[in-house]
Amino acid sequence: MMSSSDPTVLWRMSRGRSTAHATIFPGDGLTTVTWFFDGVMDRAENYDTLDLALARAEQIRGILLKDGWKETA
């Protein structure tokens, strides 16, 4: 059973042979969102609220979509 503090993959994308995904780590006081490209963490950012972290992840997803990335399962 998952709890509200379990890490969750928010989205997965690909472009050619490259892959990307965002993972969110809810926590007490801070929520961390991370981005991985080709299985390597590119960056991690901490936010004061879950809503801010989700908004940032969506912003990055939108940038990738405009850059030719496609959503995958």
Language-model features: where?
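A charge-rich, low-complexity, intrinsically flexible signal that marks solvent-exposed coils, linkers
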Residues: 3-5, 73
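N-terminal acidic leader/helix
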Residues: 5-21
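Short aromatic-glycine-(Arg/Gly/Cys) micro-motifs in beta-strand/loop hairpins
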Residues: 18-42
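Short, surface-exposed linear segments at secondary-structure transitions and domain or protein termini
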Residues: 30-33, 51-60
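A short, exposed loop/beta-hairpin motif centered on an aromatic-Gly-Thr core
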Residues: 38-52
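Edge beta-strands of extracellular beta-sandwich domains
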Residues: 45, 72-73
